[in-house]
Amino acid sequence: MPKASDIKKNAAIEHNGKVLIVRDITRSVPQGRAGGSLYRMRLYDVVTGGKVDETFKAEDMLNFADLSRRPSMFSYIDGEEYVFMDNEDYTPYNLNKESIADEILFIDEETQGISVIIVDDAPVGIALPASVELLITETDPSIKGASASARTKPALLSTGLTIQVPEHISTGDKVKVNTEERKFMGRADSK
């Protein structure tokens, strides 16, 4: 049984008789009292899809739920559902747009390394790769010779995500984006 301080994003835990997926974790250290850190977790109920906010002490013991990750690819959008196809047996997995709203910003038809998270034979979420390559659809014109400066400008990506990029990057460039920090990592290798 792991401690609350060991739980990571996209983990599945059992709490109060429910299976919950961890969507976000915020660590806080209360001032003026003895004791450890507090971990505020935004959780999603696997069955109802409802949001649950819980706070745990660092030493609280939690149970992992039985979960598996299936390598998949984004296939198509069907109304309010995103459909992913299993890379091995071509099983389609339907996920509600709301339950994967944060991850949608990093997914296009070419995104590789996606895993569908399965709990009790039902898809409950997706795990993204550490970085993805996305196309810049709109940004200010590039400035020649600006590669040495550390100034940045906003850039709109093909998925609707806006990130800060160096001034020498222009519209139409493909860039690598860190999915955890939502930050520019560099130009994508052109092949």
UniProtKB/Swiss-Prot annotation:
Matches recorded under Gene3D superfamilies: 2.30.30.30, Nucleic acid-binding proteins
Biological processes annotated in GO: peptide biosynthetic process
InterPro entries listed in its UniProt record: Elong-fact-P_C, NA-bd_OB-fold, Rib_uL2_dom2, Transl_elong_fac_P/YeiP, Transl_elong_KOW-like, Transl_elong_p-like_YeiP, Transl_elong_P/YeiP_cen, Transl_elong_P/YeiP_CS
SUPFAM superfamilies: Nucleic acid-binding proteins (SSF50249), Translation proteins SH3-like domain (SSF50104)
Record-linked Pfam families: EFP (PF01132), EFP_N (PF08207), Elong-fact-P_C (PF09285)
GO terms of molecular function: translation elongation factor activity
SMART domains with a match to the protein in the record: EFP, Elong-fact-P_C
GO CC, any one term: cytoplasm
UniProt record similarity statement: Belongs to the elongation factor P family.
PANTHER family named in the record: ELONGATION FACTOR P, TRANSLATION ELONGATION FACTOR KOW-LIKE DOMAIN-CONTAINING PROTEIN
Protein name: Elongation factor P-like protein
Originating species: Colwellia psychrerythraea (strain 34H / ATCC BAA-681)
Classification lineage: Bacteria, Pseudomonadati, Pseudomonadota, Gammaproteobacteria, Alteromonadales
